[in-house]
A protein has these predicted regions:
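Short, low-complexity disordered leader/linker segments with a strong preference
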Residues: 1-40, 62, 421-427
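Short, well-ordered beta-strand elements
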Residues: 35-47, 67-72, 94-95, 141, ...
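Helix-loop-helix "hinge/cap" segment bordering the ligand-binding cleft or interdomain interface
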Residues: 62, 68, 135-202, 214-248, ...
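Hinge/lid segment of periplasmic solute-binding proteins
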Residues: 99-149, 289-291
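Short, solvent-exposed loop/beta-turn-alpha elements that line the ligand-binding surface or hinge
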Residues: 115-127, 168, 185-188, 193, ...
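Conserved C-terminal helix/tail region of periplasmic/extracytoplasmic solute-binding proteins
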Residues: 160-161, 374-427
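Extracytoplasmic/periplasmic substrate-binding proteins
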Residues: 229-319
Length: 427
């Protein structure tokens, strides 16, 4: 398997889009498959830090020795923009990883993906979590291979040192109080935060929508208010790193948790594979556990949010049939077993796959961590709609303004509604 960075395909995209570069200059030669093999290209992000890709590609190559998979590696933060640019330029990468349903909706509505109903029909649809998110008027343009949802990571040693119990069945008020209690100064004089909220809007908006049955495309966002107030209060009290610093310094949530700078952290299940690998490589010794996401009220069902990750076939794929075969394998039981072994939650959930997951070395096995894996409801992070991408852009912009204090919560929520209604919904 050879890995290609985006630079290795930049010449072709440049020719199509007129990007910066000298006309007629020779770009890097694309790696070729070994003689007699098909070279299948797959777009990915942060290949070295996202172990599921290597696991899937190695597994597929072992099962299909006449195929060489070449990852097209893109920086995680640049991924949506770069894939959009590639597609607009007629790039022929075979398989495109759909990082979220927002991007999927845009690519599908733009006619940039191939319909793969023939692949989906071969899958165990009843047990394939997240599949409905890719249904566009009865047509599927991608199939999910993993299904992530959000829960609460916590540092067991930091909680023990503070003399507090593990964070079971927390309400948001209890979570905020606990975060403040856990905030302290480390031996090196640096702050140890009670929690860490990453800069993504979903940390506030998606969980608010999930727990209030809110519609993020509807244009009325009063249900965001309590969640923003909680987040800003934590920031003001110093119980979490302030948003402006995290944004400007491009703070890594992994670094915050793995170096003991944060005692708790709401984050998706995708991080499990990353932290297991970091511990295996000796990059962290954090003693970690999992808990359900905090809830509005205690004693009720656990509601969280999540999003499937999927593979799609580029409309201009160089090897369409092989791309479809790869997706069928990755979204099926063999692909699910492969990623389960490294701590990734697969979209396919049956007894064989689940058993394989919970035998994983290093996965917390305490009752609270196991409970975190069985939320009662997992809402979709963002509705699938042709309006999702435009709405997401507005919500992101206004989210940033609220979090850095340039708008009050009330004014920010009002502005979100006005802009979505006028710019997206045409009201």
């Amino acid at each position: 398997m050879k890995r290609t960075t985006l630079a290795a395909i930049a010449l072709a995209v440049t020719a199509g889009l007129g990007m910066t570069g000298c006309a007629g200059a020779a770009g890097p030669a694309e790696p070729q498959a070994q003689e007699g093999k098909t070279r299948l290209t797959v777009s990915v992000w942060n290949y070295e830090g996202t172990p599921e890709f290597k696991a899937l590609f190695d597994g597929y190559e072992a099962a299909n020795p006449k195929v060489d998979i070449e990852p097209v590696d893109i920086l995680a933060d640049d991924y949506p923009q770069k894939v959009t640019t590639m597609l607009a330029g007629g790039d022929t990468t075979d398989v495109l990883t759909m990082k979220n349903v927002i991007d999927y909706s845009r690519y599908a509505s733009n006619g940039q993906l191939q319909e793969i109903n023939s692949v989906v029909d071969t899958l165990d649809k009843d047990n394939l979590a997240g599949l409905d998110a890719f249904n566009v008027d009865g047509k599927y343009f991608a199939a999910p291979y993993r299904q992530d949802f959000w829960l609460l990571y916590y540092n067991k040693d930091l909680l023990k040192a503070a003399g507090v119990e593990d964070p079971a069945d927390l309400t948001w008020d209890e979570y905020a109080a606990l975060a403040k209690k856990l905030t302290t100064t480390g031996a090196d004089g640096k702050a140890v935060y009670g929690t860490y909220h990453h800069v993504w809007r979903s940390v506030i908006q998606a969980i608010a929508a999930a727990q209030n049955d809110g519609d993020q495309i509807g244009g009325d966002y009063g249900f965001f208010e309590d969640q923003y107030n909680t987040a800003l209060d934590l920031q003001k009290s110093g119980a979490t790193l302030d948003f402006g610093t995290a944004k400007s310094q491009k703070t890594s949530y992994r670094t915050m948790f793995e170096t003991g700078q944060a005692a708790m952290m709401p984050m998706g299940t995708w991080y499990i594979a990353g932290i297991l690998q970091a511990k295996k490589d000796g990059k962290t010794n954090v003693n970690w556990g999992l808990a359900p996401m905090p809830q509005k009220k205690s004693g009720g069902d656990v509601t969280t949010f999540g999003s499937p990750t999927a593979f799609a076939v580029n409309k201009n794929a160089a090897h369409s049939e092989e791309a479809k075969k790869f997706i069928e394998w990755a979204a099926g039981e063999e692909g699910a077993k492969v990623i389960s072994k490294i701590g990734v939650v697969p979209a396919l959930q049956n007894d064989a796959v689940t058993d394989a997951y919970f035998t994983l070395d290093g996965l917390p096995t305490d009752d609270l961590s196991k409970k975190a894996f069985t939320p009662d409801k997992t809402a979709l992070e963002m509705p699938v709609s042709d309006k999702s991408a435009a709405t997401d852009k507005i919500l992101n912009q206004e989210h940033d303004l609220i979090m850095v204090g340039e708008r009050s919560v009330a004014d920010g929520i009002t502005e979100m509604g006005k802009r979505v209604k006028s710019e997206v919904l045409g009201k």
